[in-house]
């Protein structure tokens, strides 16, 4: 059985850094549109369901988006999903957001891409009262190090 850790922080606690994306990469932010269910590289039933959740207002707020990091050759190197509160985690309040899932192509790991994107999300919400959540598998040391470095606290298991 997989064990998960739950982390959380608010803008008065999390740490925003001045980070620079490596020169060979650029970020695009995807938002749901009627005829765009997911970025083409991420088309799957999971992303289709989230697209439906957005349009059917299952998500408790309209902030669903996906941060995409591309190489100069237009290949997807990394993605981070920002999910609004919904029934899966009933403890989340209406304005809360979950960072994740997060995925980095193996060839692009250790470039600071996840760190950069998560920092961008923190910066985007630094003057708000939103609570951000992060869920990771207990054995995922890199993921735990990433979010603990942003001053998120482990809330539960």
What does each of the following model-derived ranges do?
Residues 125-136:
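Conserved GNAT acetyl-CoA-binding A-motif
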Residues 45-102:
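A conserved beta-strand-loop-helix scaffold within acyl/acetyltransferase catalytic domains
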């Amino acid at each position: 059985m997989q064990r998960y850790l739950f982390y959380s922080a608010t803008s008065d606690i999390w740490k925003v850094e001045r980070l620079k994306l490596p020169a060979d990469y650029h970020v695009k932010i995807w938002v749901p549109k009627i005829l765009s269910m997911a970025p083409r590289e991420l088309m799957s039933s999971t992303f289709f369901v989230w697209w439906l959740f957005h349009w059917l207002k299952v998500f408790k707020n309209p902030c669903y988006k996906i941060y995409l990091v591309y190489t100069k050759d237009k290949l997807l190197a990394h993605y981070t999903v920002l999910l609004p509160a919904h029934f899966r985690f009933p403890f989340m309040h209406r304005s809360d957001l979950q960072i994740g899932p997060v995925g980095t192509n193996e060839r692009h790991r250790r470039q600071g891409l996840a760190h950069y994107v998560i920092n961008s999300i923190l910066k985007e919400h630094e003057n708000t009262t939103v609570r951000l959540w992060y869920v990771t598998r207990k054995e995922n040391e890199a993921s735990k190090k990433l979010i603990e470095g942003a001053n998120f606290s482990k809330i539960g298991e």
